[in-house]
Amino acid sequence: MNCAANTAFANRQVITHQIREGFATVFGRSAEAMGMELVYDVAHNIAKVERYAEGDLVVHRKGATRAFGPGSLELPEIFRLTGQPVICGGSMETGSYLLVGTDRAVRDSFGSTMHGSGRTMSRAQAKRTFRGEQLQRQMKQQGIVVKAVSMSGLAEEAGLAYKNISEVVESVDRAGITKKVAEMRPIGNIKG
């Protein structure tokens, strides 16, 4: 598990580097000069040893991420007053949410919450159902720029291939597992 987690971390670092290099090429300034700093990084789909009232437990999060509340010693000091940031992705069309973990999440779900809205159909089904070119045009009409390596790959990410992000977020907010902080609307997407 540690090897897989390290590989995922390294992969995210490479992607971050490539994005910074792309911006530097386009804007003719270094990433540092533009203030392009990593704000937050977290793993999901991982197992970790964590301490709870029941003892030290291996918590496996599949389709989930950590959502520790304020005061948790598991958190870096910068987040101990607020609770853990939770980035909850929707689709390229609908946007995403920033949430924060709660004490209730620790009590009710071993400090876990979802990390995305979840799919309503498989990638293969989405490719059969949607056309990337049409999706790209629709998103352009909504003011969302999309760049994709392939149109079939883009079709996999159609908004209707995912659950309604607002409804999913509302359910965990009502349950007290996380609290809503901000809703983010897409203006641009890159699909590799």
Q: Predicted segments — roles?
A:
Residues 1-192:
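Domain-length cofactor-binding catalytic modules of enzymes
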